[in-house]
Design a protein with these regions (language model features):
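WD40-repeat beta-propeller superdomains and closely related acidic/aromatic-rich repeat-like regions
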Residues: 1-343
Length: 343
């Protein structure tokens, strides 16, 4: 029994088991299918209505999968792994329609642009940009260290992080549009929907963020651990952060968050491992190393209350909202995929 208790707005729907620790998941745009990849290199496609496994490829990436990105416009998705390959999949076929050979080295980050025209990836100290058909468009010079995260500010600008630096590239040319320096190791990245705020969790147990419109930067310190989980809501008003047992929520309303007190959501018994806002509104899902999942209703000042909860057997690897916000998927360390309806 992997699901011990469900309360509030969460209603049990279905669950399934994959062969190894889950790496990432994603819903198709219409919510009709859920795709999951695992650390053994497996790819699984589930019919989301009932949890039926439509198809799987257990050894898609030799050595294991490391990243996955759903196409934002079409029904396909892309995976990458330790084998130095990027695979572009069509949902209707249990085989990739395109294989990009990076060569030696792990492909650790992967993300489609918002318009689906370009694919960004990173391996080691370099990032590469590909067209939708897999043709390489450009690659960066080596970063100062291994690229830790990628993000798209919009369809024209892509962001990378590494030790000591955030770099904004022109997606068409690879030219540097802007750089932000910080003496520390940046371990996570979240971008506000309007592209103005770049937030990073740091190895020194702080959250650092920059505003492009003003050039100002700020640091929020005092976390008991590394803030590896960050998430903005769809309006850019709230930034939810991990870094301990509590979810710390900073409000960018008015002149915040500088000089304000954050909201603190305190129900988890162990460190936060994953955070995700619903597509619309101020509803947040949190998962922790305690196997607990909570759904929170937040206010614009960052304060909130729990609306639903579920207990699983193992650490939460990821929580992922269906595009309509009416279902939530969770992946736990035992390889269990759990889906709840959200009322």
């Amino acid at each position: 029994m992997t699901e011990k208790k469900v309360t509030g707005v969460l209603q049990s729907d279905w669950s399934a088991v994959i062969q190894d620790y889950p790496i990432a998941s994603g819903w198709t745009r219409d919510g009709g299918a859920l795709v999951v990849c695992d650390s053994a290199g497996g790819v699984y496609v589930f019919y989301a209505k009932v949890g039926e496994l439509l198809w799987s490829e257990r050894c898609a990436h030799e050595g294991g999968a490391l990243a996955m990105s759903m196409h934002p416009v079409e029904t396909g998705f892309t995976t990458a792994g330790q084998d130095g390959k990027i695979l572009i999949w069509d949902l209707s076929e249990a085989r990739p329609r395109c294989c990009i050979e990076i060569g030696s080295g792990w492909v650790e980050n992967l993300l489609w642009s918002p318009d689906g025209a370009q694919l960004a990836s990173s391996h080691g100290r370099e990032i590469q940009i590909f067209a939708a058909d897999g043709t390489e468009q450009w690659r960066s010079a080596e970063h100062l260290s291994t690229v830790s995260a990628l993000g798209w500010l919009n369809s024209e600008e892509v962001v990378s992080t590494c030790y000591g630096r955030v770099t904004i590239f022109d997606a068409a040319t690879g030219e540097h549009n802007e750089r932000f320096e910080w003496k520390g190791s940046l371990v996570s990245l979240a971008l506000s929907p309007d592209g103005d705020v770049i937030a990073c969790g740091s190895q020194d147990n702080s959250v650092h963020f920059w505003r492009r419109s003003t050039g100002e930067d700020s640091m929020m310190s005092g976390y008991p651990g590394k803030p590896t989980a960050l998430a903005f809501d769809s309006t850019g008003t709230l930034l939810a952060t991990g870094g301990g047992e509590a979810v710390t929520v900073w409000s960018f309303e008015g002149n915040g968050p500088e000089g304000t007190y954050p909201g603190s959501l305190e129900l988890h018994e162990r460190a936060i491992s994953t955070l995700s806002f619903a597509p619309d509104g101020l509803t947040l899902a949190s998962g922790g190393r305690d196997g607990l999942v909570f759904v929170w209703s937040l206010q614009s000042d960052g304060q909130g209350r729990p609306e639903g909860a579920a207990m699983l057997e193992s650490v939460l690897a990821e929580v992922c909202w269906r595009p309509d916000g009416k279902a939530l998927a969770a992946l736990d360390g035992d390889g269990v995929v759990t889906v709840w309806k959200v009322s």
